[in-house]
Each structure stands twice: as structure tokens, then as C-alpha cells.
Amino acid sequence: MDVFRRLIPYLAYLFSSFLKLTTRVKIVRGEIRDRLRAADQRFIYALWHQRQVFFTVSHRGDNVTVLVSRSADGEMMAEVIRLCCGVVSVRGSSSRGASGAVLSLMKALKSGVDLGITPDGPKGPRCEVKEGVMYLAQRLGVPILPVTNAQSNRIVLARSWDQFHLPMPFGRAAVVYGEPIEVGPGDDLNLKAAELKRALAAITSEAEALVA
């Protein structure tokens, strides 16, 4: 089993490469991301945990690092992200008091990479924004960029807590961006979390409609 777990990241890389080659992708409002980059503005991608596979596919080669948990599954995901995106993940928590992770993320931003976080991860509740991502954006002084994806050909793991989406080859996909969300020093994090949840719900519905 240990040998198989070590092989999983490499199998995932091969699968994601094949998926990228065989999927027709429509990008919606990609100019929002381009505008931030043109201004040399670092930011945090926020996406639902269930849709992280195609995020690594559609953002391969981007300067992005992802916050992953310190669990065994997190270790495996970190290796998948290293292979697929070419960056080292930050291990830890986005919660208040997780100073080590915050410092590592600050260093990553200063080195010129953007961040990727699943605000409902690592264990849910599904599609509920936790305060941690808002705290990070406030602490790091960077905007949150909502992003989502949907595929016409996929398997949904209905028994997983997040109803995990496993995209399959030879389909259509949509990658949709929302408007950046700023979190100022005096902002109410709960209100900002609700704003992000609404934004992700709206763009996810849009992405699903595009591949229906």
C-alpha cells in the first residue's frame, strides 16, 4: 500500500497531462486574473475542495502554491501539486494562530507566486467558507480571486464529504473567474466569508451551465 501511495502522484501527473490534452476548455473572465498580474498584484485563488483536480490541470505552469494539511492525504496532494504545477506546497492550517503557515505563505507571496486555498477544506462542511481564508487575505494584504470549474465528462464521488469531482478525458470544461474580493483591516470576516460563498455559488452555477 505504501508503494502504491508513492506512485499515486506520478499516476495523477500522467492522468492530468492526458486530461489537459483531450479537454476543450472555455475560460470566462480570464482578463480579471490578467489584470491583477499586469499590476503585479499577488492574490489568493479560492475554489471549492471538490473541484481542485481540474484547478491543477487548468493552472499548470502558473506561479501558484497551495496550502495543504499536514495529514498523510495532504502530503500526497502536495506531491501531486509539485508535479502538476511545478511548485512546493505550504503545509499547515489557515486558521487563526497558525503563524508558521502564515509566515510561509508570506514568503511565497514575496517570491512572486500566488496562493490557492479551498475555503471549505480539508474536511468540510462542503461549500461552506471558513473564516481562515478571509483571515489570511486580511493578514497578508492581498485580494481573493474566486475561481471554479466544471466538466461535461466527470465522475462525482457521492460518498465523499465534498462530493469530489474527478474529471474524465474527451469532454468540455469551463473555468470561470469572479471579481476579486478585498478584505480590509477593519472588515467583518464573517460578512466577507458570506460574500465569497455567494461569489463561488454564482460562478459555479455559471460554469455548470456552460458544460450542460
Regions found by a protein language model. Give the residues of each.
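Pocket-edge structural micro-motifs
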Residues: 27-29, 47, 68, 179, ...
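Proline- and acidic/polar-enriched loop/turn elements at helix boundaries
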Residues: 30, 93-94, 149
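Short hydrophobic/aromatic-rich motifs at helix boundaries and adjacent loops
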Residues: 2-6, 24-26, 48-51, 76-78, ...
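A conditional alpha-helix N-cap/helix-loop micro-motif detector
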Residues: 26, 95-99, 126
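General small-molecule cofactor/ligand-binding pocket signal
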Residues: 26-28, 90, 176
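A short, well-structured juxtamembrane/interface segment
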Residues: 17-42, 48-54
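Catalytic core of membrane glycerolipid acyltransferases/transacylases, capturing the structured
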Residues: 42-96, 157
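Non-catalytic C-terminal accessory region of glycerolipid acyltransferases
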Residues: 1-21, 34-37, 60, 83, ...
